Amino acid sequence: MKQIEKRGEALGISKLLMMENAGAAVARYVIERFSPLTDKHIVIVCGTGNNGGDGFVCARHLAALPASLEVVLLGSRDQVKTAEAKPNLEIILRMKSLESYDADSANFSQQFEKSINKSDIITDAIFGTGVRGDIKEPYASTIRLLNQSKAYRVAIDLPSGLDPATGYAPDPCVKANTTITFHASKKGLMGNREIVGELVVAPIGIPPDAEFSH
């Protein structure tokens, strides 16, 4: 997928645009699946990389809806450094139409647990394709909390912890009700229904030309 993204960039499609399309696709799924969203509480749980960036975009697209919306960053703001995720976080921080907090916030653990316990929909934007192997603390406890929730869990690109190449699912690994992956499915998502849930493949504007090197 990284090579396809690079070839997409060579065609003039920026990673920032791909992130915009990815986050918007997740927001569309939530709107179509759960509308009307009145009285629904949505928590978007974001890591500090580009998977988190997809979550920031998703939150922006959902902000105008009649749902209660929280964005939680599992890290410090200064840990978000990629050229795609950082500007999208900065937009979230300037928005008054949603609530956001990060791991540096006072009483973070208690606030996060409260958010998850009252949620109806959780969007998992913690880890993407770059994380392999067993999940360490504090992320392991975070994932367990998500899995214990009665909320509907939507994973962005893949459930956090799942190896996209081999399908290895460490304990813990997010157990999604729906996984929205982008452009094409990934080998590790196949045959893992108890982790992946319903699998949706969403286009993000990468043309067929990017599939092959020229």
Placement of each model-derived feature along the sequence:
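A cross-family phosphate/adenosyl-ligand binding-site feature
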Residues: 1-122, 127, 132-137, 187
